[in-house]
Design a protein with these regions (language model features):
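Amphipathic, well-ordered alpha-helical segments in soluble domains
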Residues: 39-42, 69, 117
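A broad, low-specificity signal for short, low-complexity segments enriched in glycine/proline
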Residues: 33-36, 96, 107-109, 220-222
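Internal maturation/activation junctions in enzymes
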Residues: 47-57, 65, 72, 77-141
């Protein structure tokens, strides 16, 4: 029922909501609370549903599942802390005086949101005679919905400050045609090839069935002074792991969907860091590991 790993278990359905942090003002604590307070009942109300299948009813009786997630966390913190936070990331998130101050502020935001979610969900359950879930927060993969607001998915950094967004449409789709009218580039989908297996280059070729619409995109903080000088692709695996564990320790009660990008020389430090965190009881760890594209190309 859940291939993504943000909720662990068996015989259950996920009731999930997501807050788009990239749309919130870091200085507006009340606005943040309102967003997470609204997300709580939006998942808790689904606990009123009665399953027809007995094993699902029993699973919910044992452990009612809800999960309030977020996306755009990286964007939110860039807006909160500015370019110095990005430069600290580029340095590996070291535990300097500045770094410890950043971590303390990150943790404060995360813990505040978690408390708000718990209070909202439990208040709803108490008022409607429902059993309280004992875990209310998670971070789901968030890739598709993040496209709606241009958020960096989940807690992850974006791939770059500026990039080309490619969206697949069927050929002659009205939205794709509108994008073309507004100046977007259109190319054949990678599934469209000629008799020799070569990619087509004409979107109006009769053999073409799908289009890729190319939309130039920049993150919301791309024009902050100095922000575009930070090479995001060089963020270390351990820096990513450290930030992931901040989320896991201070916000997430279920599990944090995490994909860590690495190069070969980072495998041992990452393995040691994961092992040490488990040994120190710092929280459940479940990571997807992906080699960086430049590391694969160098092989």
């Amino acid at each position: 029922l859940n291939p993504c790993g943000e909720i662990l278990g068996a015989d259950f359905h996920c009731n999930l909501a997501e807050v788009h942090l990239n749309r919130l003002d870091p200085d507006d604590l009340e606005g943040q609370s309102d967003a997470f307070r609204a997300a709580g009942p939006s998942v808790a109300c689904l606990l009123n549903h009665r399953f027809e299948v007995e094993r699902y009813r029993q699973s919910r009786a044992w452990d009612p599942i809800v999960g309030v997630s977020f996306t755009g966390l990286f964007d939110f913190f860039v807006h909160a802390f500015g370019t110095p936070w990005l430069e600290w990331w580029a340095a590996g998130r070291p535990e300097t005086a500045e770094g410890l101050a950043f971590k303390e502020q990150e943790a404060a935001f995360l813990a505040r949101w978690k408390t708000t979610v718990n209070e909202a969900v439990w208040d709803y359950c108490d008022r409607h005679g429902l059993r309280r879930p004992n875990r209310c927060t998670t971070v789901q993969p968030a890739g598709t919905k993040s496209l709606l607001t241009g958020a960096a998915p989940g807690w992850h950094p974006p791939k770059a400050q500026r990039f080309i967004r490619r969206i697949t449409f069927r050929k002659n789709d009205p939205v794709a045609l509108a994008c073309m009218d507004y100046g977007s580039s259109i190319v054949p989908s990678q599934s469209d090839k000629d008799e020799q297996g070569r990619l087509l280059d004409d979107p109006f070729d009769p053999r073409c069935t799908e289009w890729l619409v190319e939309i130039p995109t920049e993150v919301s903080w791309a024009n902050l002074p100095g922000a575009d000088q930070v090479e995001i692709n060089n963020f270390s695996a351990m820096a990513q792991f450290d930030f992931y564990m901040q989320v896991q320790q201070h916000y997430t009660a279920h599990n944090t969907s995490a994909t860590i990008e690495f190069r070969e020389n980072e495998i041992e430090p990452l393995a040691e860091g994961s092992h040490a965190s488990i040994g120190d009881g710092k929280g459940y760890i479940s990571e997807a590991l992906v080699a960086r594209i430049d590391a694969i190309a160098a092989c």
